[in-house]
Amino acid sequence: MEILNIQNHKRNYLPLLLLADEQEDMINRYLDRGELFALMDPELKTVCVVTQEENRVFEIKNLATVPEAQNQGYGKRMVEFICRHYRGRCDRLLVGTGDSPLTIPFYEKCGFQISHRVPNFFLDHYDHPIFEGGKRLIDMVYLEMALSD
């Protein structure tokens, strides 16, 4: 297993990124300015995009695992890698996600704690209703993890 930092042709990963953020114009807002990582084992399993939002504050914008490899620990391994990679140059690592029974417990198990929410984010920024785990997403829930030494 290896994790690669993808510098070029980031849009080649769009089909997988769309699993985690199903509106392409939203992905376009962060893909070019973010770092894209790909977990290979030996083929592509998981991708993650991380952006710098403030001085020493980074955010996981997208984390997606190919459907056949889900629930096998690849997402957790990617989050662990991201924490190691940004430790020392990042005080806080954020992740924004829908108020979903699938994603919030995942990030909490990875060590994130709920920080705040942005009301009506999915209503205001997406051109169609977004559902996850049978639940319509309305608010964006932010979780954070302290990474300062």
Question: Can you annotate each of these PLM segments?
Answer:
Residues 94-96, 108, 113-134:
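Conserved catalytic-core motifs of GNAT/GCN5-like acyltransferases
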Residues 34-36, 137-143:
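Short hydrophobic/aromatic beta-strand or adjacent loop that forms the aromatic wall/cage
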Residues 78, 102-103:
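Conserved short alpha-helix immediately C-terminal to the canonical SAM/SAH-binding motif I
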Residues 85-99:
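Conserved GNAT acetyl-CoA-binding A-motif
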